[in-house]
Regions:
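Small-residue-biased structural context
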Residues: 1-241
């Protein structure tokens, strides 16, 4: 835990964190899990199914970015830490348990669905915490400067990820979830700013022209206006093309 700010001292101004496009996607996943849990507790299979399918669509994009870019990047700077920790194998476990939920959705027995989903949820929440513990410290080793790390995120994650047919949808979904539900430690406006500002700093001008309108229409207007004024979200992407 960081030291408390002394009385009368100004808090350090926030800085853009490009790797937050991965970290705060975890918070969108956690928000989706909370919505699914509430739907199951209410016996609302329709809402549960809608939120489950949305989360799985977003998770597929996020996992592909990890499988095709993030794990190899961090293994290279962390002496194989991601592979040694079994993170890629955990993705296979996650997919196996998710298939069990998909099968249970066709079963009229709500208890069977709750059982299958609880097994997936417990594994997935553990996986998110495991990834954060292993991966987040390694991100600082990818380049010596914030600008260098932003370029790494652009080259290894944003540009390849943006080739996915669902990437634009993914950006909108993450912003929607964060701006309405926040994170486990951040209120909605902060969680949203961390993700969107990080994405802007890891995008070329052309990419940000593509992503910014998606983020804006996925965010409550008053929140977007405040963030745009405070953090220059209406200016261009920060990676030189």
């Amino acid at each position: 835990m960081p030291d408390a700010v002394p009385a009368g001292a100004a808090a350090e101004a926030p800085k853009p964190m490009p790797f937050a496009i991965m970290r705060n996607a975890h918070e969108a996943l956690r928000a989706g899990i909370r919505l699914q849990e509430a739907a199951l507790e209410a016996g609302d299979r329709t809402t549960f199914a809608q939120e489950w399918l949305r989360l799985q669509r977003g998770l597929a994009v996020h996992m592909a970015m990890e499988d095709r870019g993030m794990f190899a990047l961090l293994d290279a700077v962390g002496e194989g830490a991601c592979s040694a920790a079994g993170l890629p194998a955990e993705h296979e476990d996650d997919r196996r348990l998710a298939a069990g939920v998909d099968a249970a959705l066709a079963d009229p027995d709500l208890a069977a669905l709750q059982h299958a989903w609880s097994a997936w949820r417990d594994e997935h929440l553990h996986h998110l915490e495991h990834e954060e513990a292993v991966m987040m410290p390694l991100t600082m080793k990818t380049a010596p400067t914030p600008e260098g790390r932003a370029r790494i995120v652009n080259e290894r994650l944003v540009t390849p990820g943006a080739e996915s047919a669902d990437f634009d949808w993914f950006v909108g979904w993450v912003v929607e979830m964060l701006s309405r539900h926040g994170s486990s430690s951040q209120p909605p406006a902060v969680a949203t700013r961390v993700f969107v500002w990080g994405l802007q700093h890891a995008s070329t001008p052309d990419q940000w022209r593509r992503f910014r309108p998606i983020a804006q229409r996925s965010c409550p207007p008053a929140m977007w206006d405040e963030l745009a004024r405070g953090y220059g979200l209406d200016t261009g992407g920060k990676i030189a093309a």
